[in-house]
Protein backbone atom coordinates (compact mmCIF):
# COMPACT_ATOMS: atom_id res chain seq x y z
CA UNK A 1 0.00 0.00 0.00
CA UNK A 2 1.74 3.13 -1.24
CA UNK A 3 -0.02 5.29 1.36
CA UNK A 4 1.79 3.38 4.12
CA UNK A 5 5.19 3.28 2.43
CA UNK A 6 7.98 5.80 2.10
CA UNK A 7 6.64 6.67 -1.37
CA UNK A 8 3.92 8.66 0.41
CA UNK A 9 6.71 10.71 2.01
CA UNK A 10 8.46 11.51 -1.27
CA UNK A 11 10.80 8.54 -1.67
CA UNK A 12 11.35 7.78 -5.36
CA UNK A 13 10.70 4.43 -7.03
CA UNK A 14 14.45 4.10 -7.56
CA UNK A 15 15.18 4.61 -3.85
CA UNK A 16 12.46 2.16 -2.80
CA UNK A 17 13.44 -0.42 -5.42
CA UNK A 18 17.10 -0.38 -4.46
CA UNK A 19 16.40 -0.48 -0.72
CA UNK A 20 14.04 -3.46 -1.04
CA UNK A 21 16.52 -5.16 -3.37
CA UNK A 22 19.23 -5.14 -0.69
CA UNK A 23 17.04 -7.55 1.27
CA UNK A 24 15.65 -9.85 -1.43
CA UNK A 25 16.56 -12.15 -4.28
CA UNK A 26 12.98 -12.21 -5.56
CA UNK A 27 10.39 -9.42 -5.32
CA UNK A 28 6.69 -9.83 -6.03
CA UNK A 29 4.57 -6.82 -6.94
CA UNK A 30 0.79 -6.74 -7.23
CA UNK A 31 -0.57 -3.45 -8.56
CA UNK A 32 -3.77 -3.87 -10.56
CA UNK A 33 -6.17 -1.10 -9.65
CA UNK A 34 -5.50 1.58 -12.26
CA UNK A 35 -5.16 1.26 -16.04
CA UNK A 36 -1.71 2.29 -17.19
CA UNK A 37 -0.21 2.26 -13.69
CA UNK A 38 0.61 -1.25 -12.45
CA UNK A 39 2.61 -2.60 -15.39
CA UNK A 40 4.32 0.78 -15.80
CA UNK A 41 5.30 0.77 -12.09
CA UNK A 42 6.74 -2.74 -12.39
CA UNK A 43 8.80 -1.70 -15.42
CA UNK A 44 10.05 1.43 -13.63
CA UNK A 45 10.92 -0.67 -10.58
CA UNK A 46 12.98 -3.13 -12.64
CA UNK A 47 14.70 -0.35 -14.58
CA UNK A 48 15.71 1.16 -11.23
CA UNK A 49 17.19 -2.07 -9.86
CA UNK A 50 18.89 -2.85 -13.18
CA UNK A 51 20.48 0.60 -13.07
CA UNK A 52 21.34 0.12 -9.39
CA UNK A 53 23.10 -3.13 -10.25
CA UNK A 54 24.93 -1.55 -13.20
CA UNK A 55 26.03 1.39 -11.02
CA UNK A 56 27.40 -0.97 -8.34
CA UNK A 57 24.79 -0.05 -5.72
CA UNK A 58 23.39 -3.59 -5.78
CA UNK A 59 25.47 -6.77 -5.94
CA UNK A 60 22.77 -8.49 -7.93
CA UNK A 61 19.56 -7.65 -9.73
CA UNK A 62 16.62 -9.41 -8.06
CA UNK A 63 13.97 -11.26 -10.03
CA UNK A 64 10.59 -9.56 -10.23
CA UNK A 65 7.46 -11.69 -10.14
CA UNK A 66 4.36 -10.00 -11.54
CA UNK A 67 1.75 -11.08 -8.99
CA UNK A 68 -0.86 -9.10 -10.94
CA UNK A 69 -0.94 -5.79 -12.75
CA UNK A 70 -3.45 -3.78 -14.75
CA UNK A 71 -2.58 -5.72 -17.92
CA UNK A 72 -2.01 -9.33 -16.84
CA UNK A 73 -2.19 -11.83 -13.99
CA UNK A 74 0.54 -14.25 -15.10
CA UNK A 75 0.75 -16.30 -11.90
CA UNK A 76 -3.00 -17.04 -12.01
CA UNK A 77 -3.00 -17.71 -15.75
CA UNK A 78 0.05 -20.00 -15.64
CA UNK A 79 -1.54 -21.98 -12.79
CA UNK A 80 -4.73 -22.25 -14.86
CA UNK A 81 -2.70 -23.37 -17.88
CA UNK A 82 -0.90 -26.06 -15.88
CA UNK A 83 -4.27 -27.41 -14.75
CA UNK A 84 -5.57 -27.39 -18.34
CA UNK A 85 -2.43 -29.13 -19.63
CA UNK A 86 -2.87 -31.80 -16.96
CA UNK A 87 -6.60 -32.26 -17.68
CA UNK A 88 -6.05 -32.67 -21.43
CA UNK A 89 -3.07 -35.01 -21.06
CA UNK A 90 -0.29 -32.74 -22.27
CA UNK A 91 0.46 -29.48 -23.98
CA UNK A 92 0.34 -31.16 -27.39
CA UNK A 93 -3.38 -31.83 -26.89
CA UNK A 94 -4.38 -28.17 -26.47
CA UNK A 95 -4.30 -27.07 -30.11
CA UNK A 96 -7.85 -26.61 -31.35
CA UNK A 97 -9.47 -26.87 -27.92
CA UNK A 98 -12.10 -24.19 -27.39
CA UNK A 99 -11.99 -22.06 -24.26
CA UNK A 100 -14.75 -19.56 -23.54
CA UNK A 101 -13.47 -16.72 -21.35
CA UNK A 102 -16.81 -15.37 -20.16
CA UNK A 103 -17.88 -12.42 -18.08
CA UNK A 104 -19.84 -13.38 -14.96
CA UNK A 105 -21.80 -11.26 -12.52
CA UNK A 106 -20.28 -10.38 -9.16
CA UNK A 107 -21.83 -8.16 -6.47
CA UNK A 108 -18.45 -6.51 -5.95
CA UNK A 109 -18.02 -4.13 -8.86
CA UNK A 110 -14.77 -2.92 -10.32
CA UNK A 111 -12.78 -6.14 -10.67
CA UNK A 112 -9.55 -5.74 -12.66
CA UNK A 113 -9.23 -6.78 -16.30
CA UNK A 114 -5.99 -8.68 -15.73
CA UNK A 115 -7.35 -12.25 -15.50
CA UNK A 116 -9.41 -12.27 -18.71
CA UNK A 117 -6.63 -10.38 -20.47
CA UNK A 118 -4.02 -12.84 -19.24
CA UNK A 119 -6.15 -15.80 -20.29
CA UNK A 120 -6.74 -14.58 -23.85
CA UNK A 121 -3.07 -13.69 -24.23
CA UNK A 122 -1.73 -16.99 -22.89
CA UNK A 123 -4.20 -19.55 -24.23
CA UNK A 124 -3.84 -18.25 -27.80
CA UNK A 125 -0.11 -18.98 -27.56
CA UNK A 126 -0.96 -22.67 -27.36
CA UNK A 127 -3.10 -22.78 -30.51
CA UNK A 128 -6.36 -22.85 -28.60
CA UNK A 129 -9.58 -21.40 -29.98
CA UNK A 130 -10.30 -18.60 -27.53
CA UNK A 131 -13.68 -16.87 -27.35
CA UNK A 132 -14.00 -13.75 -25.21
CA UNK A 133 -17.67 -13.35 -24.25
CA UNK A 134 -19.12 -10.42 -22.35
CA UNK A 135 -22.06 -8.03 -22.31
CA UNK A 136 -21.77 -4.96 -24.51
CA UNK A 137 -19.49 -2.38 -22.96
CA UNK A 138 -17.36 -4.86 -21.00
CA UNK A 139 -14.47 -4.79 -23.43
CA UNK A 140 -10.91 -5.43 -22.32
CA UNK A 141 -7.87 -3.38 -23.38
CA UNK A 142 -7.64 -3.18 -27.20
CA UNK A 143 -3.86 -3.73 -27.07
CA UNK A 144 -4.39 -7.07 -25.32
CA UNK A 145 -6.97 -8.14 -27.91
CA UNK A 146 -4.37 -7.41 -30.61
CA UNK A 147 -1.84 -9.59 -28.80
CA UNK A 148 -4.40 -12.42 -28.61
CA UNK A 149 -5.12 -12.11 -32.35
CA UNK A 150 -1.41 -12.19 -33.23
CA UNK A 151 -0.77 -15.15 -30.93
CA UNK A 152 -3.69 -17.06 -32.47
CA UNK A 153 -2.47 -16.40 -36.02
CA UNK A 154 1.10 -17.38 -35.17
CA UNK A 155 0.16 -20.57 -33.29
CA UNK A 156 -2.71 -21.95 -35.37
CA UNK A 157 -5.56 -21.09 -33.02
CA UNK A 158 -8.24 -18.44 -33.13
CA UNK A 159 -9.45 -15.46 -31.15
CA UNK A 160 -13.02 -14.20 -31.40
CA UNK A 161 -15.27 -11.91 -29.40
CA UNK A 162 -19.00 -12.16 -28.84
CA UNK A 163 -21.78 -10.69 -26.73
CA UNK A 164 -23.74 -13.95 -27.07
CA UNK A 165 -23.02 -16.33 -24.18
CA UNK A 166 -24.80 -19.26 -25.89
CA UNK A 167 -22.50 -18.83 -28.88
CA UNK A 168 -19.46 -18.81 -26.59
CA UNK A 169 -20.58 -21.94 -24.71
CA UNK A 170 -21.38 -23.93 -27.88
CA UNK A 171 -18.86 -26.79 -28.23
CA UNK A 172 -16.57 -25.25 -25.59
CA UNK A 173 -14.09 -27.64 -24.00
CA UNK A 174 -13.53 -25.15 -21.18
CA UNK A 175 -15.71 -22.36 -19.80
CA UNK A 176 -13.91 -19.84 -17.60
CA UNK A 177 -16.39 -17.46 -15.91
CA UNK A 178 -14.91 -14.31 -14.36
CA UNK A 179 -16.21 -10.90 -13.38
CA UNK A 180 -14.44 -7.79 -14.57
CA UNK A 181 -15.22 -4.10 -14.86
CA UNK A 182 -15.60 -2.47 -18.27
CA UNK A 183 -12.38 -1.06 -19.70
CA UNK A 184 -14.07 2.36 -19.98
CA UNK A 185 -14.94 2.28 -16.25
CA UNK A 186 -11.40 1.27 -15.34
CA UNK A 187 -10.06 4.16 -17.43
CA UNK A 188 -12.38 6.61 -15.60
CA UNK A 189 -11.22 5.27 -12.24
CA UNK A 190 -7.65 5.99 -13.35
CA UNK A 191 -8.42 9.62 -14.28
Placement of each model-derived feature along the sequence:
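Glycine/threonine-rich flexible loop motifs
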Residues: 37-39, 108-113, 182-191
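Generic, ordered loop/turn and secondary-structure boundary motif
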Residues: 14, 65, 139, 181-184
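Charged helix-capping and loop-helix junction motifs
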Residues: 11-15, 113-118, 191
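Detector for methionine-enriched segments
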Residues: 19, 23, 33, 46, ...
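Short, well-ordered coil/turn residues at beta-beta hairpins
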Residues: 30, 177-178
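Glycine-rich phosphate/diphosphate-binding loop of Rossmann-like nucleotide-binding domains
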Residues: 1, 85-177, 183
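Phosphate/diphosphate ligand-binding glycine-rich loop within oxidoreductases
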Residues: 1-85
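Flexible, active-site-proximal loop/turn residues at the rims of small-molecule/cofactor binding pockets
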Residues: 33, 180-181
Amino acid sequence: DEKKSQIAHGETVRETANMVSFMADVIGIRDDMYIGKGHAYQKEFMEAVTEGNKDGILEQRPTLVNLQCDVDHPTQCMADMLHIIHEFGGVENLKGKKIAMTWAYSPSYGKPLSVPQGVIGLMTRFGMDVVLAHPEGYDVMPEVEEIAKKNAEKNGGSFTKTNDMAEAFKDADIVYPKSWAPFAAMEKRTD
